[in-house]
A protein has these predicted regions:
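Conserved small-residue
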Residues: 23-26, 30, 37-136, 171-217
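Transmembrane beta-barrel architecture of outer-membrane proteins
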Residues: 15-16, 24-30, 52-58, 138-142, ...
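Outer-membrane beta-barrel "beta-signal"
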Residues: 31-33, 302-314
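Single conserved hydrophobic/aromatic residue that forms the stacking wall/gate
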Residues: 1-11
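Extracytoplasmic gating/loop element in the C-terminal half of outer-membrane beta-barrel translocons
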Residues: 162-266, 270
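Repeated loop/turn-to-beta-strand initiation elements of outer-membrane beta-barrel proteins
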Residues: 41-42, 152-157, 259-260
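Membrane-embedded beta-strand positions of outer-membrane beta-barrel proteins
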Residues: 32, 48-50, 157, 272-274, ...
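Transmembrane beta-strands of outer-membrane beta-barrel pores
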Residues: 36-38, 52-58, 150-152, 161-165, ...
Length: 314
């Protein structure tokens, strides 16, 4: 939609332009798969498999009202790019607050300190910059699998993972942001115990009796009652890396032939298989499953599953 095409400044504020397919976006990427087979003697073989998908895009033309700074424009950035403030840690003391640009609401020591990108002496939406692209959707996805077979035994393993995938803690859809739990909701959130740990948050020395607790690099800002207008802004302070590598499947199977069963029941062979799913994940999120990053851990976690399966071949 173009809210500006062909309109003067006066009319832009009074007329709602209709939607139109007038933008241009470039999309590109790559995908591929590979399989390797190796026979080992007459009783064993190994199969290695891998695949990947890489997807990127860039807006070439987005008709919009003129922005005061180029980093506020959509042109040249990915579609649905996440914008936010650049955090500089936490305010150290009241002097630090007074010597810094004005921010949001009543700011105190222990609150998040933002960078004044345009240098106008105040923090506003004009200081929001592109933080990351794709808003919770990974640019890179891949899988790695292997099969090892020896006589009647078969071992299968499957890994899957993502790359180039960031998110905001507290963003319910990876884009909107209402604050990091438990700072936005006092009655729920599976990370409340993390914030409760004094080592993870800024605490005034007036209460702790220890100057070291006023840590400007703490994981959490100061605690407060209700909602803090300053600390619930989208920023690099709440940005996380959602890339991961997961051991998705691991199975061990044994193929068995019992002549007596073939004569009596017509069963030519049986395959007994132990299947394990979602066994382990390596990531930097830690406090909840990285595939649930956009839900901020409020969804039911992905369980590990174990099953014993029996297949009959008649």
């Amino acid at each position: 939609r173009s809210p500006s095409r062909g309109l003067g400044d006066v009319y832009k504020r009074q007329i709602q332009m209709p939607y139109g397919n007038i933008g241009r976006m470039k999309s590109w990427g790559a995908d591929g798969n590979m399989e390797f087979y190796q026979q080992i003697g007459k009783d064993a073989h190994v199969i290695l498999r891998s695949n990947f998908t890489l997807s990127k895009n860039k807006i070439l033309n987005w008709e919009d009202t003129k922005k005061p700074y180029t980093y506020l424009e959509n042109n040249g950035y990915a579609n649905n790019v996440q914008r936010g403030f650049v955090a500089m840690g936490l305010f150290k003391d009241q002097q630090d607050v007074e010597m810094s640009p004005t921010q949001f609401g009543t700011v105190r020591p222990g609150d998040i300190k933002y960078r004044d990108i345009n240098g106008d002496g105040k923090i506003t939406d004009d200081d929001k910059v592109p933080l990351f692209a794709y808003s919770g959707v990974p640019q890179l996805m891949y899988g790695i699998g292997a099969e090892f077979r020896y006589k009647s035994w078969t071992l299968n393993v499957l890994f899957k993972g993502t790359g180039r995938n960031k998110f905001l803690y507290g963003g319910s859809d990876g884009k909107s942001f209402d604050g990091y739990m438990p700072f936005n909701q006092k009655d729920k959130g599976n990370i409340m115990t993390i914030a409760y740990n004094p080592e993870n948050r800024w605490i005034s020395a007036e209460y702790s009796g220890n100057q070291a607790t006023e840590n400007p690099n703490a994981r959490f800002p100061r605690l407060y009652y209700g909602k803090n207008e300053n600390n619930t802004k989208p920023s690099t302070f709440w940005m996380g890396d959602a890339r991961y590598l997961r051991l998705q499947e691991l199975s061990l199977a044994y193929n068995l032939k019992v002549p007596a069963l073939q004569r009596i029941l017509g069963i030519n062979s049986m395959n007994i298989q132990l299947m394990c799913e979602n066994l382990a994940v390596w990531d930097s999120v830690k406090i909840f499953d990285p595939e649930q990053a956009t839900s901020c851990g409020q969804a039911y976690p992905l369980p590990a599953r174990y099953s014993l399966q029996l297949y009959l071949n008649f």
